[in-house]
């Protein structure tokens, strides 16, 4: 309501109001009429609506002629009001239908009665209740008068995106809606505000969206936004897709495994780091094929994403591409070697797209494409990605080919004005590596010396940047590429620090002369072209005909390289190609090996304090001419090993010391062709003016001068501050040199003495690489990980004819011989040799498969070298990088592992687990359980760590995935499974295509021909997959089987060498998915495939019966849980061990099958188990394959001698090398061996994974093997010997379980122990009582030791207790029963000889183990044990139980029995009970307990006095009295046997019988005690089992309780609702009453009114009465008035 002249008027009166309000004097005017507003039925309420507006408004507001479609700022109140009061235009402006997701900036006018404008397709922030949109309402004033109403909402995805609706208070139907994304730069304080602000939303919101939906939402929001992530000089383009990708990464519900905490850098810290997609380590191998696109912008260059804005075409004068080209339909050279590859568009460096609408200029400062973090970025040059030539790009050295048009290109570099032509149309200046659209040329334009683009090596530009003489006005150029931590951690470049960048390239003008004269600058003087191959068409290798590297006047002492060429077929050799570029990106087939090229290398000038580091650049030289390297003896330059002869491609490893005088001349003597010499600089940051001699022993100190922590100036080629470099390398002249100063080129050249570095031959005679769409596979073969100071670039290409080591003339020798140097990496069987700088900085390994080159040098063995030198190998890759805390996940680790023995182990945070070599270069282990967090992972050989450490992550489960939700885990809809199967197969096909491609490259390399790669590998299979996906019926399985068989037939699987880091569906492999779907045929096909290509890593990962998913479920677990009988049987028969692997809740497959009602399945598997055990029992009696005895010189024994802590091996411990082929594991099994020796302090690893002893078949064989090793008797092993010896759990006792208290469980038998490199006691059959091994336990000097827990404090917390799964059906009584039954039903007592031997050894052991105080003559028992204190009756009762038990259990043999036993020969039948495995009495294979060894007894006895033993278990221990009694018995037995041993028994039969009888009673007492000991162990195991069972039971109980709680809540809610219903009933009653009352009132009023009316009618004709009053009362009567 508006007040006019003291009267209140209706706000929007719909009727014509009489014109009693005049504009002249009033505050409010009747404004223009509004067009009629129709109601819903289309009826116009009236002709026009008059609106009263404040007069002030009309005076101050102009009328608007038009409503802008877009405005990228908020309107002022005055502007809004002006639009809203321009009524006459509204009809023209109104939008009649709601727009879906209007773009950022849109301004739209709606009529709210006709259009539901709020349904605009965006997702707006909701209130806490989640139902209504969160709106802010406010009234806005214009000229102090409130006249506008505003309603604001903001996006729930990007909080900076708003929708604001405005309307006039007087005319609320017309609404002006404005959409705007307001990057709050002032809030963020960062130039990259919009993105930073955008990401602070909650994860829940993101979880709802797919990537496509997000892009749909975000594209319009970011329309027209120009982000400048700039530090003043530069800005960089950005796209919505990248933002979405980054947001999804930052909000992933299950984050990808991260190998480290990310430190994304760039010069701007947060600004550039936002877009860092950091799970790149995972995708190192399979790189996406990126099509470089052309672009020819004049003024700007853009690096944009593929589809940033669809359909917006800006006219551009340099357009040379069409959309088809952009989308990759036109094949172009893809010369990208990605270090990190994501299948989504990570690392795509794309040349600008001319059809892009909003150009963003880029400059040398930053990556323009946020996903390019791993790739060198375009430095100050426009659409040509020329960084690759601009300065030794160490980051995965990419050569970018782009198409050059004739347009001029501008640099945005800070040193030049925006219009400075870096590459002018005639290519007269600057340096650009480009491919022109027609002729694919490498152009090296000539440069003037003054304004040329100087290519400074890193340390030079550092000196330029940081030296005091630097020209004050010059802007320090930013780093040319972003630092990628993944790349750094896994592939650090030479001398790189964490956070350092790559080379800088800058426009160097003449005033560089003022900087210290330390650089070598290279200028190219002319241009030459020839062809390189790409795909099937070859593009020519182009090169400067005569490219003289001329040093600019700046360098007093800079060397100038002159590159002259007589012919036309030179190699492209821009100064910036880094080592990997040389081989990976170039096609050498076009090299004409008969032309002569001359090149002179001369050093011009000298300076006393220069440390020269040549930048990595090539120069070509003539083979026949000497190449003089002159060194000024007065200068401190060290050009050691400046040039070497290399028949085809050369590397020059030049390392420098701070002072090295001497004249070195190196001659080239060679007959062959082209030499590509590479200056491989090491860019060690020298101290500022170079005067300092580097005496430091840590690289860090030298670098700190230049690397100021605050500013991430990426100095040179990234210094790598590495703690491991201990010590400096001294040069020949005695001057210390940091290890990182030693730079090796393409070869592992170690340089302990720097007089000259030796070199390796790199022969590329038959080396042909074609660039096809399979390019990445080629690169796979070249992937090499560089580490640390003194890095060696590990590409080793050796061919037979050129394997001579050329020696520099001053005779400095390389520290390694030719044979050591030439280990080819081509065949996986041979170790890549790894050398490192003399003091042992880590170096590099790479597998290279070039030609099938084989060298005898491999015999030397990489590991042999390593053992002697004590150096460290690099882990080149490992997958996966993470696990949940339960562990058990299979981890594959690649590196130079070659020894085919089982002596490898992996250390996860010092927890050792055994590893096995599944093929040369690939180790497999299963990670142990561990707390969450990052841990180090290292490889050990013979318990000595031989690898660098990499980071492995244990992740906590996100709350929704905690094990309680696992009750729903083992169920999924079929479609999801099927889709996943197809996805996995597609991944494998992609791998196959890559591998096929790379193999074709390799085959083609033999002839040096065209080498066209073929990507057709995957075609057929994919078609199959597609059709499979189409018909997801019963034939789905058969279709998948067909696909698998097709893939299986390809040979490439055998050659797969690299780990795949594919994203799995919930951690499930192909085998998991097949099992979950019950596809038995598919499973059999996969098994065939796996056996056919046993070495394939891909299949190792995809098809492994013991691998577990994210909830520790094996494929067998899935099959059991979902009731697939056939699949379960196939899986069980393939690998039985899977049946004992529990899931993360500790449930076993059979248990789950039962609980889910698949009883038949459970029974079937149990039946299979029983059958097997019965067969094993019989088989083990008969077959005992004898095994050979090893020679004492076996390396295992040697190692044993070294590893023992005392120098000599204790008596009786012999090392057995495993010569038995049975001991070589089949591929599908995880490694069976735990190495205990050396890791005693580490917690035991998770046991249920590597379950050696559940695999009984092999075990029985091993047992036999072990039994056949003869040894007359076991020597005493003194309990006092400090040598720890492993405890062997006897195969029959313990039913293949793990004893939890002992050290990490040891292998099942002596023979397998031998292969696990442990000391082993040889057994003879006599030492076995019913086939149980003697058990050794660590003794301690007093002889009263108990087995030390392996770091007791650590074992228990680290391990889940769900491990003792095999024992879950056994109860102690069964063993008692079995024992009693067996002893009662034995027809024949043991032959006396064996009783003698057993009792003798038993007595010996007992006497040996008895504590000294009990042996003393004046024996006084200790204060009674806790047990006796509490209940003295217990012991006596146990003793009486013992007595009665002995009476029942065994009838003593009569003399006749004894006589027959002595007279009869040992027949097999009488000896049956002695057979090693015993008779299969019980299904669980419980045997009569063993006669424990001395060490066992000492454990048992000392447990009696141990205070730690719980009182319940104390009943199982012996009191002092019992111990004394036992000791006396043992002595008696000993003396009796000694007395009667040698005499003829016939004479003294009677006497002997009596003595033996007496001893036998004692002996049985002893066996009972042995039994008691076994029971003691069993009970502890049972306790552990009960505990684990209780845990899973408790989990279930909790789950049920939560269900109950939910039900209760539901009930409460229902009853509450009912109450609620009752209340409204009451309310209605009240309302009815009130209505009645009011109706009574109105009746009374009516009556009164009628009376008045009657009176008035009577008076109608009276002149006194006013007729108007009468009319009014009439209206009142009709109810129209009040």
Curated annotation (Swiss-Prot):
SUPFAM superfamilies referenced in this protein's UniProt entry, alphabetically: Ankyrin repeat, E set domains
IQ domain sequence ranges: 1549-1585, 1586-1608, 1609-1631
Low complexity composition bias: residue spans: 1308-1318
Keyword Transcription set for record: yes
Biological processes, Gene Ontology terms: neuromuscular process controlling balance; positive regulation of calcineurin-NFAT signaling cascade; positive regulation of transcription by RNA polymerase II
Principal localisation: nucleus
Motif Nuclear localization signal: where in chain: 112-119
Listed transmembrane segments: none
Record's protein name: Calmodulin-binding transcription activator 1
């Amino acid at each position: 309501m508006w007040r006019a002249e003291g009267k209140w008027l209706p706000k929007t009166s719909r009727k014509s109001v009489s014109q009693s309000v005049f504009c002249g004097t009033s505050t409010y005017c009747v404004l223009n009429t509004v067009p009629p507003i129709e109601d819903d039925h289309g009826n116009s309420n009236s002709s026009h609506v008059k609106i009263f507006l404040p007069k002030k408004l009309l005076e101050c507001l102009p009328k608007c002629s038009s409503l802008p479609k877009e405005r990228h700022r908020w309107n002022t109140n005055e502007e809004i009001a002006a639009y809203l009061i321009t009524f006459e235009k509204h009809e023209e402006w109104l939008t009649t239908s709601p727009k879906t997701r209007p773009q950022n900036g849109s301004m739209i006018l709606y009529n709210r009665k006709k259009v539901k404008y709020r349904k605009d397709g965006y997702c707006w922030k909701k209130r806490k209740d989640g139902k209504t949109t969160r709106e802010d309402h406010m009234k806005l004033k214009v000229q102090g008068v409130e006249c506008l109403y505003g309603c604001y909402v903001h996006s729930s995805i990007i909080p900076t995106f708003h929708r604001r609706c405005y309307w006039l208070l007087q005319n609320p139907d017309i609404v002006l809606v404005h959409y705007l994304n307001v990057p709050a730069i002032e809030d963020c304080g960062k130039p990259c505000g919009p993105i930073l602000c955008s990401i602070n939303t909650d994860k829940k919101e993101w979880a709802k969206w797919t990537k496509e939906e997000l892009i749909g939402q975000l594209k319009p929001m970011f329309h027209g936004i120009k982000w400048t992530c700039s530090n003043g000089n530069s800005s960089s383009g950005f796209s919505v897709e990248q933002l979405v990708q980054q947001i999804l990464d930052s909000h992933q519900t299950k984050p990808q495994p991260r190998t480290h905490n990310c430190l994304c850098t760039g010069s701007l810290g947060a600004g550039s780091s936002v877009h860092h997609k950091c799970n790149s380590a995972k995708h190192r191998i399979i790189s996406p094929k990126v099509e470089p696109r052309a672009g020819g912008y004049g003024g700007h260059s853009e690096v944009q994403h593929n589809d940033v804005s669809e359909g917006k075409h800006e006219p551009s004068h340099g357009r040379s591409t069409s959309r088809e080209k952009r989308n990759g339909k036109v094949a172009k050279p893809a010369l990208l070697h990605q270090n990190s590859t994501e299948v989504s568009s990570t690392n795509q460096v794309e040349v600008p797209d001319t059809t892009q609408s909003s150009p963003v200029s880029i400059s040398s400062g930053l990556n323009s494409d946020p996903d390019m973090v791993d790739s060198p970025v375009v430095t100050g040059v426009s659409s040509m990605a020329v960084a690759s030539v601009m300065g030794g790009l160490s980051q995965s050295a990419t050569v970018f080919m782009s198409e050059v048009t004739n347009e001029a290109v501008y640099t945005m570099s800070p040193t030049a004005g925006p219009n400075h032509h870096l590459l002018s149309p005639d290519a007269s200046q600057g340096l650009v590596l480009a491919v022109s659209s027609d002729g694919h040329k490498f152009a090296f334009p000539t440069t003037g010396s003054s304004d040329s683009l100087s290519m400074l090596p890193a340390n030079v530009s550092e000196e330029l940047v940081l030296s005091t003489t630097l020209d004050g006005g010059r802007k320090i150029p930013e780093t040319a590429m972003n630092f990628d931590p993944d790349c750094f951690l896994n592939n650090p470049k030479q001398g790189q620090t964490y956070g350092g960048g790559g080379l800088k390239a800058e426009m160097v003008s003449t005033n560089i002369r003022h900087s210290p004269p330390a650089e070598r600058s290279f200028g190219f003087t002319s241009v030459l072209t020839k062809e390189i191959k790409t795909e099937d068409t070859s593009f020519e290798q182009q090169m400067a005909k005569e490219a003289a590297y001329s040093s600019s006047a700046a360098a007093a002492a800079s060397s100038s390289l002159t590159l002259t060429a007589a012919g036309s077929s030179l190699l492209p050799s821009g100064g910036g190609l880094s080592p990997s570029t040389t081989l990976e990106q170039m096609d050498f087939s076009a090299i004409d090996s008969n032309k002569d090229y001359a090149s002179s290398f001369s050093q011009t000038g000298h300076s006393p304090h220069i440390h020269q580091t040549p930048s990595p650049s090539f120069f070509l030289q003539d083979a026949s001419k000497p190449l003089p390297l002159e060194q000024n003896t007065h200068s401190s330059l060290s050009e050691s090993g400046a040039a070497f002869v290399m028949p085809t491609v050369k590397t020059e490893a030049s390392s420098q010391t701070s002072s090295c005088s001497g004249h070195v001349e190196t001659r080239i003597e060679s007959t062959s062709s082209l030499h590509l010499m590479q200056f491989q600089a090491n860019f060690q940051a020298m101290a500022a003016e170079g005067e300092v001699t580097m005496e430091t022993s840590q690289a860090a100190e030298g670098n700190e001068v230049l690397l100021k922590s605050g500013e991430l100036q990426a100095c040179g080629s990234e210094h790598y501050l590495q703690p491991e470099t201990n010590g400096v390398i001294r040069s020949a002249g005695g001057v210390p040199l940091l290890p990182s100063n030693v730079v090796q080129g393409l070869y592992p050249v170690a340089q302990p003495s720097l007089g000259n570095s030796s070199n390796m031959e790199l022969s590329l005679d038959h080396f042909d690489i074609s660039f096809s769409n399979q390019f990445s596979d080629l690169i796979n073969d070249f992937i090499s990980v560089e580490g640390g100071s003194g890095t060696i670039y590990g590409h080793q290409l050796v061919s037979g004819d050129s394997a001579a080591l050329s020696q520099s003339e001053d005779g400095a020798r390389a520290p390694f011989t030719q044979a050591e140097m030439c280990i080819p990496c081509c065949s996986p069987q041979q170790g890549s040799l790894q050398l490192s700088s003399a003091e042992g900085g880590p170096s590099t390994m790479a597998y290279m498969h070039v030609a099938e080159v084989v060298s005898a040098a491999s015999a030397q063995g990489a590991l042999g070298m390593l053992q002697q030198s004590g150096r460290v190998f690099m882990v080149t890759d490992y997958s996966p990088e993470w696990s949940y805390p339960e562990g058990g996940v299979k981890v594959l680790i690649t590196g130079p592992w070659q020894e085919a023995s089982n002596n490898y182990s992996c250390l996860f945070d010092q927890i050792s687990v055994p590893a096995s070599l599944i093929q040369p270069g690939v180790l497999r282990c299963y990670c142990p359980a561990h707390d969450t967090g990052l841990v180090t992972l290292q490889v050990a050989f013979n318990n000595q760590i031989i690898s660098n450490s990499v980071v492995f992550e244990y992740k906590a489960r996100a709350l929704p995935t905690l094990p309680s939700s696992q009750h729903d885990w083992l169920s999924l809809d079929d479609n999801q499974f099927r889709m996943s199967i197809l996805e996995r197969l597609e991944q494998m096909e992609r791998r196959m295509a890559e591998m096929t491609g790379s193999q074709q490259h390799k085959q083609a390399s033999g002839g040096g021909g065209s080498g066209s790669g073929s990507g057709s590998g995957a075609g057929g299979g994919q078609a199959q997959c597609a059709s499979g996906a189409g018909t997801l019926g019963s034939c789905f399985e058969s279709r998948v089987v067909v696909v698998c068989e097709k893939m299986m037939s390809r040979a490439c699987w055998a050659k797969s060498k690299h780990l795949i880091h594919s994203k799995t569906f919930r951690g499930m492999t192909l085998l998991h998915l097949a099992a979950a779907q019950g596809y038995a045929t598919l499973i059999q096909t996969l098994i065939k495939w796996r056996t056919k290509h046993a070495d394939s890593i891909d299949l190792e990962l995809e098809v492994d019966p013991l691998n577990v998913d994210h909830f520790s479920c094996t494929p067998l677990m899935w099959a059991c849980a979902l009731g697939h009988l056939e699949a379960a049987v196939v899986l069980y028969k393939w690998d039985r061990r899977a049946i004992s692997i529990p899931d993360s809740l500790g449930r076993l497959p059979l248990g789950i099958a039962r609980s889910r009602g698949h009883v038949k399945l459970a029974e079937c598997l149990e039946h299979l188990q029983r059958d097997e055990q019965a067969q094993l029992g019989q088989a083990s009696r008969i077959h005992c394959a004898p095994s050979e005895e090893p020679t004492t010189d076996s390396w295992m024994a040697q190692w044993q001698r070294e590893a023992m802590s005392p120098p000599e091996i204790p008596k009786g411990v012999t090392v057995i090398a495993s010569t038995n082929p049975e001991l070589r594991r089949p591929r599908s099994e995880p490694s069976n061996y735990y190495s205990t020796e050396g890791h005693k302090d580490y917690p035991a690893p998770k046991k249920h994974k590597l379950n050696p002893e559940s695999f009984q078949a092999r075990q029985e064989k091993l047992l036999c093997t072990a039994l056949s090793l003869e040894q007359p008797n076991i020597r005493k092993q003194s309990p006092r010997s400090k040598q720890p010896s492993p405890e062997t759990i006897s195969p029959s006792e313990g039913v293949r379980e793990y004893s939890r208290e002992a050290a990490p469980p040891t292998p099942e038998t002596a023979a397998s122990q031998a292969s696990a490199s442990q000391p082993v006691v040889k057994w003879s059959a006599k030492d076995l009582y019913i086939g149980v091994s003697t058990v050794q336990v660590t003794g301690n000097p007093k002889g009263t030791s108990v087995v030390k827990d392996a770091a007791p404090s650590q074992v228990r917390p680290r391990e889940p207790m769900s491990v003792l799964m095999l024992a879950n059906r056994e109860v102690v009584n069964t063993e008692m029963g079995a024992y009693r039954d067996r002893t009662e039903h034995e027809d024949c007592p043991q032959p006396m000889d064996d009783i003698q031997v057993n009792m003798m050894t038993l007595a010996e052991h007992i006497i040996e183990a008895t504590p000294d105080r009990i042996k003393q003559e004046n024996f006084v028992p200790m204060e009674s044990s806790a047990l006796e204190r509490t209940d003295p009756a217990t012991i006596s009762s146990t003793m009486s139980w013992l007595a009665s038990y002995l009476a029942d259990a065994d009838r003593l043999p009569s003399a006749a029995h004894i006589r027959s036993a002595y007279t009869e020969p040992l027949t097999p039948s009488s000896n049956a009970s002695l057979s090693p495995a015993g008779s299969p009495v019980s299904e669980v294979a419980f045997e009569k307990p063993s006669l424990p060894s001395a060490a066992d007894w000492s454990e048992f006895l000392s447990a009696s006095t141990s205070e730690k033993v719980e009182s319940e278990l104390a009943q199982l221990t012996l009191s002092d009295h019992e111990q004394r009694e036992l000791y006396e018995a043992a002595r008696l037995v000993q003396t009796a046997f000694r007395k009667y041993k040698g005499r003829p028994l016939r004479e003294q039969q009677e006497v002997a019988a009596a003595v033996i009888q007496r001893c036998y009673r004692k002996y049985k007492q002893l066996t009972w005690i042995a039994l008691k000991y076994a029971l003691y162990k069993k009970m502890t195991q049972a306790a552990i089992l009960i505990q684990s069972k209780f845990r899973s039971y408790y989990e279930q109980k909790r789950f049920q309780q939560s269900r109950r709680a939910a039900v209760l809540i539901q009930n409460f809610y229902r009853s509450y609702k009912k109450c609620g219903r009752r209340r409204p009933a009451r309310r209605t009653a009240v309302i009815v009453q009130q209505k009645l009352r009011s109706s009574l009132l109105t009746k009374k009023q009516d009556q009164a009114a009628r009376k008045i009316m009657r009176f008035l009618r009577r008076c109608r004709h009276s002149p006194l009465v006013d007729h108007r009053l009468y009319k009014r009362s009439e209206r009142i009567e009709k109810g129209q008035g009040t």
